Structure formats: structure tokens, C-alpha cells
Swiss-Prot record:
Superkingdom per UniProt: Bacteria
Protein name per UniProt: Ribonuclease H
Family per similarity comment: Belongs to the RNase H family.
HAMAP family xrefs: RNase_H
EC number: 3.1.26.4
Keywords: Cytoplasm, Endonuclease, Hydrolase, Magnesium, Metal-binding, Nuclease
GO biological process: DNA replication, removal of RNA primer
Lineage: Bacteria, Pseudomonadati, Pseudomonadota, Betaproteobacteria, Burkholderiales
Domain RNase H type-1: 1-141
Known cofactor(s): Mg(2+)
Length: 145
């Protein structure tokens, strides 16, 4: 399987508010940058969208290293998701899972890949994360009239 590194980030001006997402995909010497924005969203939805769009860009099953500064994404996919699914997309408190639409999409997109999830401290000089952050901010800026 091809090895791919994904750096992802989301940004939001207001929460909720205008948001953007960005991702950098690295496969050997090839790199691809992705970004986009949404007019009325949250920081967590943008963090998730960054990973979703990056995984959508993969055309075949890959071994993937995902780097995110979102503990919500990292813990959600690594720790919370199995329980949510077992409880019919309810939290341990029996409340509906927030962003269930995106979690379900992410759950589908991860299936063909072998993914290792990494949390990195945001705005701490990590080059891949800094690039993803800049792309997420471009996504926000793309919405400015």
C-alpha cells in the first residue's frame, strides 16, 4: 500500500461563524494542498471536514499517518466512535452525537485505509500543521465578499 501523510486543520472566525479547512497530503515526493470554506459552521466541523476531504482525495487504499491539532478529531475517531456506533449514535449520556453526519462519513472513509492518528500541539511550529493552518485560513478568506 502507498504511504501517505496527511496534515489537517480547521479554522473558524466566530464559533459558529465563517470557517475554513485545510489539508496537506504528502506521498513520497508528491504533495497536494486542499482547502475550502463554509459560511456558517463550527471549528470542530471544519477540523473534521479537513480530514474527510483529505481522505476523499485518496484514490486507492493507503497506509496513512494523519496529523491533527484537534483532540476532538483524534479522540473521536480513536476512542469515542466505537461506543457511539454501539449506542446508535448516542453519547454515554444518551444524547445525540454532535456532528454525527460528519462522524458517519469519516467512519466510512477510513475503512479502506490503514490509518494511524497523531495529535500535534497547534501553533507550535510543526511545519505540516502550520501549512494546514494557513490553508484553513485561506478557506475562511475565500468566503470574504
Amino acid at each position: 500500500m502507498q504511504e501517505v501523510i496527511i496534515y489537517s486543520d480547521g479554522a473558524c472566525k466566530g464559533n459558529p461563524g465563517r470557517g475554513g479547512w485545510g489539508a496537506v497530503l504528502v506521498a513520497g515526493t508528491n504533495e497536494k494542498e486542499l482547502f475550502g470554506g463554509e459560511a456558517n459552521t463550527t471549528n470542530n466541523r471544519m477540523e473534521m471536514t479537513a480530514v474527510i476531504e483529505a481522505l476523499r482525495a485518496l484514490k486507492r487504499p493507503c497506509t496513512v499517518q494523519v496529523y491533527t491539532d484537534s483532540q476532538y478529531v483524534q479522540k473521536g475517531i480513536s476512542e469515542w466512535l466505537p461506543g457511539w456506533k454501539a449506542r446508535g449514535w448516542k453519547t454515554a449520556d444518551k444524547k445525540p452525537v454532535k456532528n454525527a453526519d460528519l462522524w458517519q462519513e469519516l467512519d466510512t472513509l477510513v475503512q479502506p485505509h490503514k490509518i494511524t492518528w497523531h495529535w500535534v500541539r497547534g501553533h507550535n511550529g510543526h511545519p505540516g500543521n502550520e501549512r494546514a493552518d494557513a490553508l484553513a485560513n485561506r478557506g475562511v478568506a475565500s468566503l470574504a465578499s
